[in-house]
Amino acid sequence: MKKRLTLTFWGMLVAFSVMAEAVKVTSPDGEYEFTVSDDGQLSYSLFYQQKEVIEPSRLGIEWNENWYDGIRIVTSRNSRIDKNWKPVYGERAVVKELYNACEIELAKTGSRKRMVLDVRAYNEGVAFRYRFVGGEYLKIENEFTQFTLPKGTLAWHTERAQTPYNLLPLEGWENESDRPLMLQLPEGQYACLAEAQVVDYVRTKFKLSDEKPYTLLTSMYGIVEDIAPYHTPWRIVMCASRPGDILANNDLLLNLNPDCKIADTSWIKPGKVMREVTLTTEGGKALVDFAVKRRLQYIHFDAGWYGFEYDKSSDATTVTLDPRRNEQIDALNLQEVISYAKSKGIGVILYVNQRALQQQLDEILPLYKSWGIAGIKFGFVQVGSQIWTRWMHEAVKKCAQHGLMVDIHDECRPTGFSRTYPNLM
């Protein structure tokens, strides 16, 4: 009996030491070292080229329960991916996808639930996300992900997509900063905080912590609701000695999205486009001739071709000119222009405001395909909430089913979805 008790006690000590040990994930080239710890609270840190670029920072999420305090690492499983893939278009003919991965299973004191922290370390940067298994209802009310930067770090702050950038210290911000956020570190390095695969989540921005200096908090636009299995977007940290190198490594966002879901992509052809402003048949044909001469690939009819874009009664299945833009309501024979453009090797893109998209999307897609247009420009899409984020990405999928490319107007920031659905230009 005494021997059994001794062995049992020793086994408990071994198990405890394994669970309490920090989990480290390094990039294939060894430049990045990402460490996750559960010393009372779940936290992480990140070294790049042996310099600490993210100091110990909080991890956690509030979903049905507060998963911040009392979190412990249960198990971890490592893997490695090394492959190449060919994008439909882009800066490279072949994209390298090489990373070390770790699935870290987490438990909470007093709870039978489990959560997984997925970590990937690439040579271009490190990414992590929260993942939920099982089939239960999820209500995510807060994401506790923090980024504590070295003292003296400066940030290229911008409130939203169409506001100026200002180089600011990590203190005294008047408002939140949009993502991605470029940082100038005190020892001459640069870092970028970005995100990928934001397809069924809310918009998040950065705000300064009132309690911890030089710390950025994740600010959610609203709550997220779904049914597990489910995962949050990837949170990304990219580092470099020069800011241009971070831009050159932007394939990382694509690599953090699933493979292409479109079997035949031959119809997806990027190119230069010019807007037709007269909304007339003559103007459309003249612009086609100009496009041929100037080696452009597309012409574009913007707001007004189907009526006043902000009037919900405007019908995007008809060519009904907005008198604010052209008083001669029968001035545009759209089908004639499309046929003429096609004979010249030029594609036609049509603008549709979200008001009409929301009401008529399933009706207009097969119709536009029959008209022979090349794509749609989504106008003034709403961004921020989970509902509208999901709607937009589902709309891109539907366009792919009808062989239509998509250009999105307004404050939508792409997060790599064009790898999965490359009809999103």
Language model regions located:
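Short, flexible loop/turn elements at secondary-structure junctions
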Residues: 108-110, 121-123, 151, 240, ...
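An acidic-aromatic substrate-binding cleft motif
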Residues: 230-298, 302
